[in-house]
From Swiss-Prot:
Enzyme Commission number, as recorded: 1.97.1.12
Function: PsaA and PsaB bind P700, the primary electron donor of photosystem I (PSI), as well as the electron acceptors A0, A1 and FX. PSI is a plastocyanin-ferredoxin oxidoreductase, converting photonic excitation into a charge separation, which transfers an electron from the donor P700 chlorophyll pair to the spectroscopically characterized acceptors A0, A1, FX, FA and FB in turn. Oxidized P700 is reduced on the lumenal side of the thylakoid membrane by plastocyanin.
One Gene Ontology CC term in the entry: chloroplast thylakoid membrane
Protein residues bound to chlorophyll a B1: H654
Organism lineage string: Eukaryota, Viridiplantae, Streptophyta, Embryophyta, Tracheophyta
Binding site for [4Fe-4S] cluster: C559, C568
Biological source species: Morus indica (Mulberry)
PANTHER family for this protein: OUTER MEMBRANE PROTEIN, OMPA-RELATED, PHOTOSYSTEM I P700 CHLOROPHYLL A APOPROTEIN A1-RELATED
Transmembrane region(s): 46-69, 135-158, 175-199, 273-291, 330-353, 369-395, 417-439, 517-535, 575-596, 643-665, 707-727
Enzyme class, broadest EC rank: oxidoreductase
Protein name: Photosystem I P700 chlorophyll a apoprotein A2
Amino acid sequence: MALRFPRFSQGLAQDPTTRRIWFGIATAHDFESHDDITEERLYQNIFASHFGQLAIIFLWTSGNLFHVAWQGNFEAWVQDPLHVRPIAHAIWDPHFGQPAVEAFTRGGALGPVNIAYSGVYQWWYTIGLRTNGDLYNGALFLLFISAISLIAGWLHLQPKWKPSVSWFKNAESRLNHHLSGLFGVSSLAWTGHLVHVAIPGSRGEYVRWNNFLDVLPHPQGLGPLFTGQWNLYAQNPDSSSHLFGNSQGAGTAILTLLGGFHPQTQSLWLTDIAHHHLAIAFIFLIAGHMYRTNFGIGHSIKNLLEAHIPPGGRLGRGHKGLYDTINNSIHFQLGLALASLGVITSLVAQHMYSLPAYAFIAQDFTTQAALYTHHQYIAGFIMTGAFAHGAIFFIRDYNPEQNEDNVLARMLDHKEAIISHLSWASLFLGFHTLGLYVHNDVMLAFGTPEKQILIEPIFAQWIQSAHGKTSYGFDVLLSSTNGPAFNAGRSIWLPGWLNAINENSNSLFLTIGPGDFLVHHAIALGLHTTTLILVKGALDARGSKLMPDKKDFGYSFPCDGPGRGGTCDISAWDAFYLAVFWMLNTIGWVTFYWHWKHITLWQGNVSQFNESSTYLMGWLRDYLWLNSSQLINGYNPFGMNSLSVWAWMFLFGHLVWATGFMFLISWRGYWQELIETLAWAHERTPLANLIRWRDKPVALSIVQARLVGLAHFSVGYIFTYAAFLIASTSGKFG
């Protein structure tokens, strides 16, 4: 008999039912569970797959460049970034009638096109690209890098080039190379690109390979570097009347500390950005020389950890045993990496709009909204993944003997206290926030809006004032003109920063009031509840009060009836599954808040947000209902318009989302009976019964159905909001 799918598990391959297919897909990437796996092969497979991942990323970015160069309007956009709409790619659709062709032919294109809301035009423009030829060159280069990555992945699967386990577990060498090589050298290289290509480009000078060695990035060349007069590189910066991409008002400085934004582009000064990357490079190049490898100098991480024993023995044996625990657990390492990456992705969402780095992106409102929402959702999925792999670590890799009385064991010892405190915080936030909102709703409904409970966020306003925002009247730190903090920065970055923070045309430290106070606490409720579910899932992964022996049941055991007191909703997977719903809800509140506040700011009617955001009906009526009118008008009796695709996606998103409930609120027996009936009918229907299948059809398991339901819920939720966000923003601001 030929080998059946899945080849990596002979046990599953023998399964006579359709379970074989679903379980095979589910465990395809769980290398640890495959037949004949060894620790060495596990590490080698993961390592090789990283190169495949890189190849896909480079191919994808190459495709972005290629399609914009081929079908976009980059050169026209460069001439007038504020009024030309950037084109992502052409649309070829045989179903388009004349009205659709007319609706989607825009941005100076000859046929139907998609508008780009990703910010790539602004990014490419800022870093010095100017022509379609530049874009094609970039696409070809990335295609080449993609091919190199694929070859490297294949190479590292060949016996001669397979690294050993000891190589993968050499933590110090890996840290040194990643810190110095990945962050240090790449930041230094990026500084070089900004100084040699992007900054001259912003001043109207076109630097390419043919004149790269002839154009001095700074009139004095490397002289100031070698004579120690580094301040010369900061002298004569671009003036406030500088036109980006033009020599008019341009200076000669390359590394500055101006603070604030370029008045025309509303983005950070390019010379400040170059300075920042140089500083990052310097720090990481040093950091990558700190750990002990073959040369016998520097820190040994194991020694560092074992020296960490708090005084008075208040944390037991401190960090003893942690080095081997972490170094021998891929799931622990992945959990740490995902947690870090999740936080950084959320920070990217925050900083892309509050401190925009790319020229003119701040004036492209739809792109700002899309990028913020995109990065917050990505961050949510990555962060929940961190806890999932933390739970798998406890089940598969945690050894109580190795970690006796250290900080990890003590976390498990007092998990009840951690979980109950989180529970209390979530309940407190939930009841109080909902109570305030509902009280305000009732007051509005009874026509007495003056009886609302409106709380000024004075602590947050004080923090904003400390950073230099003067409108609240707190005379503190940077908003006080006679303090030491103010005087220290007065000659360098402070004037630019204070100008930016007190100007109303950007998103830096937005003015906040009672509506912000309430939604902030609603978001805090979501964050704490999501964290509660995730933390409980990880800390109870090996055993809980109800079921102290979860280790041999694994990560995703299903509901198993009341025999052992019931195992429903107590596997680590169940906690992850529930947490994702909370994560999506929380990010829903975050993005609603961000978007509503910003559209009222951009439209100049910020009082609408301030007045309507203090009660739930305000959110439902003045944000969701009011802004979905464009969507509902994508198709109307007069034909269609360019929002019709978003109107369709809005409907389709709701459909996918609602389909999720068919899998979530259901009984397995019902589906099994339905399947048996369908199979019976099929076998007795002429013609149809010529088609046979080898596997007996069985209903999805409880865990599988939940996964399918969760996937539909998530995808539908995100599709629906993406369509709403893009249509309502682009419908208002063109």
